[in-house]
């Protein structure tokens, strides 16, 4: 569906250790530059088709509303990274766009998502795919 970056791989022990200690890992390759542009274009196209009263960023469960989003969330490279962090038995709980376009002025303070979720134990992973260069 979307071209995988040739650098996609399993997480290193160092990355898994960082996740265990700090709760995050960054800079993990998933999609090629062409695929990122395709994702950006798809986001723009989808946004333009929504009614004005629907904010694409405040709508959850896109994996249930869009086959393309569903397939995106099941990209093997992404699932491998999640498995490296929490093991092979997991489910997708949500699916949401979170667009913070360059120079839009919005601020998201540092936080860990698990404190906002009704999950117990809080053994969860957020996968954030950056498609905008902020």
Feature map (PLM): residue ranges:
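Non-heme Fe(II)-dependent double-stranded beta-helix
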Residues: 1-22, 26-119
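Short, conserved beta-strand element in jelly-roll/cupin
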Residues: 111, 118-134
